[in-house]
Amino acid sequence: MLSFFKKKIVVPHVRLTGVIGAAGRFKQGMDLAGQRAILKKAFSFKKIKHVAISINSPGGSPVQSHLIYSYIKQLAKEKKVKVIIFAEDVAASGGYLISCAGDEIYANSSSIIGSIGVISASFGFKDLIKKIGIERRVYTAGKNKSTLDPFVDEKEEDVKRLKSIQLELHADFIKVVETSRGSKLKEPEKNNIFTGEFWTGSAALKLGLVDGVGNADQVLKEKFGDKVIIKN
């Protein structure tokens, strides 16, 4: 017997927004602990073939970025589901790392995409505390316990140690991007893709950092038809 009813396609849609980092009672942040339940729910729908995830994040903690990325990959593998990522205002640094969990990445033409690098920033207060007459006392067990102390002169060995950690984290980030994007990337060295530079969505498309330009509703309807059910 022929069916006169076309099977409806359902695509769960999750939104991940904010600076990436551990959240607390008085601190907002996007971390795996806060996103685990909504991600698990999205992948738990029966008979789905795709999950859509919109990302709006400038980055943050490399650890939480990687944890969220890995959890999305894990769920996709377990449920045999494809992941479609949609970058909104920004998917940069850790936000882009999470985007790499997608089988496809889309962005708005004006989205900010990339910033594949690592940054650390601080201030030096040595002259300030001297000027206002504050005497600082520090007691440690372990000669490197006060590494990068902002109240004393910067030490060359401290900076060197920090740089080595940054390079290690950067290498891990690059590996994730290369694994995700592969041959889609257009001449990474020539185009400074791994230098921390960032681009608009339109420029990112030309570099192979995203697969297309468009928003979730538009792209999902183009892919699955006007009657696709997007479960937000």
Model-based region annotation:
Residues 1-108, 119-232:
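N-terminal organellar transit peptides
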